[in-house]
């Protein structure tokens, strides 16, 4: 089994930081939303208690029943201008939180991409001394996205908020939450708690899922683009291997693809769908094969490349001759590369 390397560990740290930032955004949103929800239901609290206490009593010559009380609640809390105003405000705030979260994701992916592209370049140079990659950094990636996107053919698209769809879905969920809670006879506190949980948790889970999916795509795209560059510039043909996370959360199709090896420019067969790498939807793989994926693609010989201190051939910058030396660590290789600029 491929062991986690420095690129894997760096990617995991970046994802953990990203999730912390997203959770912080939603914690603040939850606090603000709770204030709006509390204000809305406080308006009804006293009257709601009075109407509930009337059950079994005569009102306007007719016995006031549980059904009458439920209908009153629907008319007062489940419909009308007040609910619409609350619905619109909550949906807008949740959408704003998701917009910030996606901006965080888009800001993080260049660093994740460059880390994995550079690390893969290091593994290739370790066994192919003729290769001489140029280092990528976050700013280089951001510039190339605009100026030379063809240099990074596998770089994932930016995540974009579908504002209209998100708003409409949020409003629908809010209305359904209030109406459903009333029909189930929940107390005002229970209605309030369910509404807060549904709107915030639903949006936060969606944002975290988008972050994990985007990080996986950027991680593996960086590796793929190094394979492609090695072939284009030095004729080095790499084979790639699908590596699935070994636990019970891994979906069946991805577990079955584990250790599948193909040429770097050929797709994997994952559950009958073609994918160039984990997180790749360019060949038509559906969302259920992409979302929350934790798989990675590695060079098919990465198990050998990652072993401690193999010998490697490098060019002596003073003599121009190739020499056999102990394999450099990634940090040593990176520092030497950086010193060349």
Model-identified regions with their sequence ranges:
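N-terminal leader/targeting and assembly helices and adjacent pre-domain segments
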Residues: 1-199, 300-341
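Acidic, glycine-rich two-metal-ion catalytic cores of nucleic acid-processing enzymes
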Residues: 205-310
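Charged, compositionally biased non-catalytic regions
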Residues: 194-198, 202-210
């Amino acid at each position: 089994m491929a062991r986690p390397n420095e690129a894997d560990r760096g990617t995991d740290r970046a994802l953990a930081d990203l999730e912390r930032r997203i959770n912080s955004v939603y914690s603040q949103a939850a606090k603000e939303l709770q204030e709006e929800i509390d204000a809305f239901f406080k308006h009804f609290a006293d009257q709601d208690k009075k109407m509930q206490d009337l059950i079994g009593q005569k009102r306007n010559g007719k016995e006031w029943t549980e059904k009458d009380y439920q209908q009153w609640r629907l008319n007062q809390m489940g419909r009308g201008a007040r609910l619409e105003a609350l619905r619109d405000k909550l949906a807008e705030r949740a959408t704003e939180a998701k917009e910030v979260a996606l901006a965080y994701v888009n800001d993080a992916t260049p660093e994740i991409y460059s880390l994995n592209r550079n690390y893969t370049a290091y593994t290739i140079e370790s066994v192919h001394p003729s290769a001489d990659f140029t280092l990528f950094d976050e700013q280089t990636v951001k510039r190339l996205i605009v100026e030379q996107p063809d240099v990074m053919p596998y770089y994932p698209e930016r995540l974009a908020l579908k504002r209209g769809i998100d708003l409409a879905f949020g409003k629908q969920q809010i209305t359904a939450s209030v109406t459903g809670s009333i029909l189930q006879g929940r107390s005002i506190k229970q209605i309030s708690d369910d509404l807060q949980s549904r709107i915030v948790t639903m949006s936060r889970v969606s944002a975290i899922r988008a972050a994990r999916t985007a990080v996986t795509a950027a991680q593996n795209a960086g590796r793929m683009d190094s394979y492609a560059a090695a072939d284009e510039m030095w004729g080095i043909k790499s084979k790639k291997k699908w590596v699935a996370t070994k636990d019970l959360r891994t979906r069946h199709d991805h577990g079955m693809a584990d250790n599948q090896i193909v040429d770097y420019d050929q797709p994997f067969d994952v559950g009958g769908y073609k994918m160039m790498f984990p997180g790749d939807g360019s060949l038509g793989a559906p969302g259920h094969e992409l979302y929350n994926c934790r798989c990675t693609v590695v060079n098919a010989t990465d198990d050998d490349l990652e072993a401690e201190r193999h010998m490697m051939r490098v060019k002596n910058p003073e003599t121009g001759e190739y020499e056999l030396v102990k394999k450099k660590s990634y940090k040593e290789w990176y520092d030497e590369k950086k010193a060349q600029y």
